[in-house]
Amino acid sequence: LIALSLAACFALPLQAKIVTDVEGNKIELPDNVQRVADLWHANNQIVLLLGGANKLVGTTTSIAANPWYSEVYPNIKNVPVLTNGETIQTEELLSHKPDAVLLSKKSMLTEVEQAGLKGVRVSFQDFDGLKKTVRITAEVLGDKAPEIAENYIKELEGNIQFVESRLKGLKDE
């Protein structure tokens, strides 16, 4: 009985968490994600905002070439460029062993999953979508990212309310 109990303990998987992406897909990730490839240029800034820059193991051509990004995060020059936004360098992506791959395109998600990696779709076209993507990215990153995300969203909502209050009563001409 003791041997059976010990065997069961060793058979348990490492701690995991379930993250739900923008389409409602549930993805099982390690509880403590350490390596993230962010293959959507618009989301790389969110990773920085949430304090996850040190977890980046892959980025996009447009981010690597962006002078602003290099100014804010000089180490981006050392992060491998794994996509031009259309195609993924799958073999190189695999070599960097990401715990999670953030991306926006369904076709890329399929490619990542076929390679045996954990893909998490993020995407937004409006403020509600932005807030959802910030929360998803924070959940993937873990650590203090969820707290940072909620503070950012609170500030964003406050700014939106401020602008709406200033525009209230204005008429289209």
What do these predicted regions represent?
Residues 37-96, 100, 105:
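A short, structured surface patch at a secondary-structure boundary
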Residues 2-11:
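Bacterial N-terminal signal peptides
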